[in-house]
């Protein structure tokens, strides 16, 4: 049997992390078994579905590099197919027209609730032989079996059983002629030959209804696997108040797709004690049997740790391709300064996100107008004038500009003045970066460049001179 899975989001908003994890599990299962992965856009909610949401979903999938083999399919382009199947069901007697008014249905609901019963349609039109005009408004309902039960072997949770007496005669076509979500899903899974439906646990109650429709159509029934929800670290359902929940928001916040994928795959699935997984390892090791039945707690600190790991272990040239977007958001002109791959090497240890990296690298490319006030007050004092003058002259004398020779110049200055490295290094750091913190000083000065470093030292000396004149 050829394995075929699908990811079927509704385009009513962005791609959130719960949906992304479902997509990842479906994608991994298909890839593990050498099968196919289908992208389907379930846009039957015409009022809430938007082109912007569709674009956001596609952007999220592409950024995560979860490539699909078929699609994207759009349900709104398949209405003729759905309605043709409904018409066949009406002919076969597995569906029927319902003319009950909203008022009657509301009254029925109130009466059932008053008796402590579960609200459900009472089947009045199912057994009615009353004549109606062809143009009289009606819905079409599925004639759900009235006895027995539906049992399916959930690939994560084990056997689940529903009594047919608990299930309603589901509306499959509205009065305006449009098919409903639960019906469209069934026909799509049938037509697209989906073998495994991997989705959120909020769909468990839909499953027996969909299985009954498939059986009425003499269609094969796929295997089902329902993934538990993701909670915030406070145990409540993950929401905006827990921070970013949109996949692309994590991109905007400076996370690498590898970090988010690695984090999401472990959010409910495990393989021993292993924490770090390459994409290839995920594909090789993934199984639905190792997915937890329990809800998972989203831990941003863990994601941040993974992101820092990947910034420092992936090829700098690759990380730089993602950093470029953040550099552009900061409007930094990188033509006069180190290559971005070099910047990744310089700042990788200090920065946990690419956004942080982009926001802390401007001094490598552009001159600053002011020194950080606290750093200048502490380190650009009259006592720093001589160390800065000496180190400037030694840097000027370097003919082979390298980090190693920069280091020798700083060390030689400290030796000549018989002071500790900090007495030279800290004023120099503030002079060339404008702040009190940076990567190792030798590689920083080297990356900034000889001419620019000397110009900035002279600027710092001018700052010190002005400070002396005011005392």
UniProtKB/Swiss-Prot annotation:
Entry keywords, A to Z: Aminoacyl-tRNA synthetase, ATP-binding, Cytoplasm, Ligase, Metal-binding, Nucleotide-binding, Protein biosynthesis, Zinc
GO CC aspect terms: cytosol
InterPro entries reported in the protein's UniProt record: aa-tRNA-synth_I_cd-bd, aa-tRNA-synth_I_codon-bd_sub2, aa-tRNA-synth_I_CS, aa_tRNA-synth_I_cd-bd_sf, Glu-tRNA-ligase_bac/mito, Glu/Gln-tRNA-synth, Glu/Gln-tRNA-synth_Ib_cat-dom, GluQ/Sye
GO biological process, one term: glutamyl-tRNA aminoacylation
Binding residue positions for Zn(2+): 98, 100, 125, 127
Catalytic activity from the UniProt record: tRNA(Glu) + L-glutamate + ATP = L-glutamyl-tRNA(Glu) + AMP + diphosphate
Transmembrane intervals: none
Entry EC no(s): 6.1.1.17
Motif 'HIGH' region per UniProt: ranges: 9-19
Cofactor: Zn(2+)
GO molecular function: ATP binding; glutamate-tRNA ligase activity; tRNA binding; zinc ion binding
Motif 'KMSKS' region location, chain numbering: 237-241
Subcellular location: Cytoplasm
Binding note for cofactor: Binds 1 zinc ion per subunit.
Top-rank lineage group of the source organism: Bacteria
CDD domains xref list: GluRS_core
Residues noted as binding ATP in the record, renumbered to the chain: 240
Subunit text: Monomer.
Function: Catalyzes the attachment of glutamate to tRNA(Glu) in a two-step reaction: glutamate is first activated by ATP to form Glu-AMP and then transferred to the acceptor end of tRNA(Glu).
Family: Belongs to the class-I aminoacyl-tRNA synthetase family. Glutamate--tRNA ligase type 1 subfamily.
Protein name listed in UniProt: Glutamate--tRNA ligase
